[in-house]
A protein has these predicted regions:
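Extended, subdomain-level signal for the structured scaffold at the beginning of enzyme domains
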Residues: 1-115, 124-127, 180, 184, ...
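Short gly/pro/ser/thr-enriched loop/turn and capping motifs at secondary-structure boundaries
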Residues: 122-124, 143-144
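Residues at the C-termini of beta-strands that transition into short coil/loop
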Residues: 56-58, 74, 140, 159, ...
Length: 199
């Protein structure tokens, strides 16, 4: 389910910059699938349509749920130049949604930066109050608990939901679907068709 997105990127000469905010024990596959779509968009067009960076709350390296460490480009505060922010969560997301994270996410939202949740990153957005009035989705294992904890949210049992400037997906390969729709809304369906043929 998607509403239109207008970042005016088709007319811009600079790349659309996506910052991935990693939470501890993030799901590596969901993150790498999302980045893979952006990389393929650049490769197929031979242009730098998208750039991306990886940040953590405090700028320190993090270990994924698979036990692999990812190089971090900076802290959440360093992500001011992002056009889009995507929060990547994992199995233990509730442990990591403290005041510093919610305050940081609210600052991002106040700058009118579109923001999304990959896998359980949706939970972090909900805790910060950034999904109030929006449709959203989350990993299927977390659907019931999210509905119970946030009964006012409109939570869909969908692979992904794009509602205005909020983007959420259920994790795993659904981050591919989310990012394909994001790319389609910015750079068109023809490019997405070409990207899809590579996966």
């Amino acid at each position: 389910m998607s509403d239109s997105i207008d970042l005016n990127a088709t007319e811009a000469e600079t790349a659309v910059h996506v910052c991935f905010l990693m939470l501890p024990e993030y799901t590596l596959s969901a993150f790498s699938n999302a980045v893979g779509i952006l990389r393929m968009a650049n490769r197929l067009t031979d242009r730098r349509l998208y750039s991306w960076s990886v940040c953590s709350l405090d700028g320190q390296p993090l270990i994924s749920s698979a036990g692999l460490e990812l190089s971090i480009d900076g802290s959440l505060e360093d992500a001011a130049d992002a056009n889009i922010m995507m929060v990547c969560g994992g199995y233990q997301v509730k442990k990591y949604c403290g005041k510093a994270l919610t305050d940081g996410l609210r600052k991002v939202a106040k700058k009118k930066i579109p923001i999304g949740g990959i896998d359980t990153g949706t939970y972090a957005l909900a805790v910060a109050g950034l999904l109030d009035g929006y449709r959203c989705t989350i990993h299927w294992e977390n659907l019931s608990s999210l509905r119970e904890e946030f009964p006012r949210l409109e939570i869909a049992s969908s692979l992904f939901v794009i509602d205005r400037d909020r983007y959420t997906c259920s994790g795993g390969i659904s981050s591919i679907d989310l990012m394909l729709n994001l790319v389609a809304s910015i750079h068109g369906h023809q490019l997405v068709q070409e990207i899809s043929e590579q996966f």
